[in-house]
């Protein structure tokens, strides 16, 4: 039994690691929709915990990476309630595995969705690809600065080939 235990522990650890990686991969949703001029492909993930973005209760925040034939590549956050306070542009504090970065953000003047672009989409993609944990602090109109945390370790970069 003493001889078998180390090998058994190693097998258990590998199984737990594989299970954790599968859980992290399942957090991401990938889209591939036909649009005029080609296909829009995307990778999206919800925040680990809901965030109160309007003073009326907590809701998930979504981080999306999109590749569109007409609009190109973009990364943005989407709220279910409240609004971003970033119409003239803003600076976002992004923490990737404990290391702080500052990226530019902007809120488009549209009512289609409550979205805010992370303007340096290439850098955010690189951080998401290389990190396990990503948090983004963003300004809201109603309740000031809020932070959404994402478990990004399961991102499958090959699903958005033009981003790599």
Locate the predicted segments by residue.
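A generic "folded-domain core" signal
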Residues: 2-164
């Amino acid at each position: 039994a003493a001889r078998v235990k180390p090998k058994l522990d190693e097998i258990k650890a590998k199984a737990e690691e594989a299970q954790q990686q599968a859980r992290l991969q399942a957090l991401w949703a990938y889209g591939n929709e036909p649009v005029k001029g080609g296909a829009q492909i995307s990778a999206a993930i919800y925040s680990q915990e809901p965030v109160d973005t309007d003073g009326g209760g907590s809701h998930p925040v979504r981080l999306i990476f999109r590749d569109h034939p007409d609009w190109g590549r973009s990364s943005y956050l989407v709220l279910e309630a409240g609004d971003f306070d970033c119409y003239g542009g803003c600076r976002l504090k992004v923490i990737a595995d404990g290391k702080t970065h500052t990226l530019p953000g902007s809120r488009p003047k549209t009512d289609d969705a409550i979205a805010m672009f992370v303007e340096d989409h290439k850098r955010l993609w690189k951080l998401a690809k290389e990190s396990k944990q990503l948090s983004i602090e963003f300004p809201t109109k109603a309740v000031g600065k809020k932070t959404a945390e994402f478990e990004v370790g399961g991102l499958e970069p090959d699903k958005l080939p033009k981003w790599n």
